[in-house]
Amino acid sequence: MAKLENPILMAKIGGAQGLRGEVRVSTYTDDPMALGDYGNLVTADGRVFEILEVREGKNVVVVRFRGINDRNAAESLNGLELFIERDNLPDDELDDDEFYYADLEGLEAVDAEGKSYGAVSAVYDFGAGDLLELKGAGRRPALIPFSEAAVLEIDLEAGRILIDPMAAGLIDNPDDKDQNGMSPFGKK
């Protein structure tokens, strides 16, 4: 059993594939075929899985793990999430404007005056562009676009992101109000 200090979700096991213990796996890696390049995978309860083989499947990869040799054993893994330690991710391959989602979580979102809008609690990718979820004390969670217009600067060492709250949709543009003081969203 292994316990990870800073776990990063890499994959989720689906159903069994065939009779020899292979499983279908959805990966959260840039290259699904590279899943085995990160070392052993660990479940939330500390079980360690060594990848013996990875091959392409339809919309997934098909993986064979050491010690999983038949369909019954493979079926027992259905739904398991697989993690690695954050330190196993290669930082040297990132460009200056690239970040791992896990590194963004916990960063405080502030504007140019230093006003806090909460901390990044999650990063979502729905296909049309990434969104950052901000949560703060006394505030409802808010989703902001992870775009150059909304997120002006990311400072991992300082633990903060500099945002433009208007571009992020957190405050109204005063120029958008009509003569009655109403914004296009029906707010004063």
From Swiss-Prot:
InterPro entries: PRC-brl_dom, PRC_barrel-like_sf, RimM, RimM_N, RimM_N_sf, Transl_B-barrel_sf
Record key words, sorted: Chaperone, Cytoplasm, Ribosome biogenesis, rRNA processing
GO terms, molecular function: ribosome binding
Primary role: An accessory protein needed during the final step in the assembly of 30S ribosomal subunit, possibly for assembly of the head region. Essential for efficient processing of 16S rRNA. May be needed both before and after RbfA during the maturation of 16S rRNA. It has affinity for free ribosomal 30S subunits but not for 70S ribosomes.
Stated name of the protein: Ribosome maturation factor RimM
Entry's localization field: Cytoplasm
Family, as annotated: Belongs to the RimM family.
Keyword rRNA processing: yes
Lineage: Bacteria, Pseudomonadati, Pseudomonadota, Alphaproteobacteria, Hyphomicrobiales
The keyword DNA damage appears for this protein: no
Single GO cellular component term: ribosome
PANTHER family reported in the protein's UniProt record: RIBOSOME MATURATION FACTOR RIMM (PTHR33692:SF1)
Domain of life from the UniProt record: Bacteria
Subunit structure, as described in the record: Binds ribosomal protein uS19.
Gene Ontology biological-process annotations: ribosomal small subunit biogenesis; rRNA processing
Residue ranges of domain PRC barrel in the record: 96-169
Domain remark in the UniProt entry: The PRC barrel domain binds ribosomal protein uS19.
Gene expressing this chain: rimM
